Regions:
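PLP-dependent amino-acid enzyme catalytic core
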Residues: 1-304
Length: 304
């Protein structure tokens, strides 16, 4: 089973663009979207040590939580199928069905039992876990826990090995904060980790992020910033400007991105670069993490 997690490091792709040259920026994309067709991106990283732990402790099922477009739900279902683990997904929104969108449909096809609950019920996750999966290995919403952060921290190790040095900046979208926190545990004062939240009012994530950093590293040596208001209206919401940017970015780079996670990160990263040195000084090296999430892109109906 461990062979599955022994992939070669995901590619580090250079972005050549006159826009970046104008500001003296070297931009690389860490292509975690290429790690696996279904268990891809940061979900591959976050599930790694959780799946290994579940198997080593002889669990036969996984239970987790998520929303209608949750990449974590889709990836957990796929991983469960790969490793012969039953999967249960508690889904926020009792108006939904297993065929409401491609994400839920694919999770169902991969054998996940979906349980739809009201938004009020969803807040009682501990009670739901006890009710529907007493003997299951429980993964939190988004898969974010200490084992997930451990897996995500390995992204920084790969970046440093591939570049031969620490970059000036590493950027990542933030939904539950696990990948961001993992990167921060391996950052140094010379590398600033930038997080772009994809949800409204995400400040509640900060205590858990800081606790994770304190568990694995030295908070005094952590250099990071989170942009709390760069979410384009909230989770799974878009703007015409965002969608137009995604079209241009894909045409110029050949890299497919989606509008819920990585698309927002790249959009706002380019906006920061375009501020003519107000944020990024010239001659900086930036590595942007592509966290995958393409599984539900083709037919998702997003809110403008």
């Amino acid at each position: 089973m461990t062979e599955f997690w022994d992939n070669e490091p995901s590619p580090l792709q250079t972005i050549d663009n006159p826009f970046l040259d104008k500001f003296g920026i070297r931009l690389f994309v860490k292509r975690d979207d290429l790690l696996h067709q279904e268990v891809s991106g940061n979900k591959w990283r976050k599930l790694k040590y959780n799946i290994l732990g579940a198997k080593q402790n002889n669990f036969v099922s996984l239970l987790t939580f998520g929303g209608a477009y949750s990449n974590h739900i889709a990836a957990t279902a796929a991983a469960g199928k790969l490793f012969n683990l039953q999967t249960i997904g508690i889904i926020r929104g009792d108006e939904l069905t297993p065929y409401s969108n491609p994400t839920l449909k694919r999770a169902t096809e991969n054998g996940m039992k979906l349980i739809f609950v009201s938004r009020a019920e969803y807040e009682g996750k501990m009670e739901l876990a006890q009710k529907y999966g007493q003997s299951s290995y429980v993964l939190p919403e988004g898969g974010t826990n200490l084992l997930a952060a451990r897996g995500a921290s390995e992204i920084m190790d790969e970046i440093v090995s591939q570049l031969g040095c620490y970059p000036n900046y590493v950027t990542v979208p933030v939904a539950t904060g696990g990948t961001f926190a993992g990167l921060c545990t391996k950052s140094t004062l010379q590398t600033r980790v930038l997080g772009f939240t994809v949800i409204k009012n995400g400040e509640y994530l900060l205590p858990q992020i800081n606790d994770t950093i304190a568990t694995f590293g030295n908070p005094d040596e952590t250099n990071y910033e989170i942009f709390w208001d760069f979410h384009c209206g909230g989770y799974a919401k878009t703007t015409p400007e965002l969608l137009n940017f995604i079209d241009r970015f894909q045409t110029q780079t050949g890299i497919e991105i989606e509008p819920i996670y990585s698309g927002k990160m790249f959009y706002w990263l380019y906006e920061l670069i375009n501020r003519n040195g107000d944020y990024f000084e010239p001659n900086q090296t930036i590595v942007a993490i592509h966290t995958g999430g393409l599984q539900g892109k083709p037919k998702q109906s997003l809110v403008l």
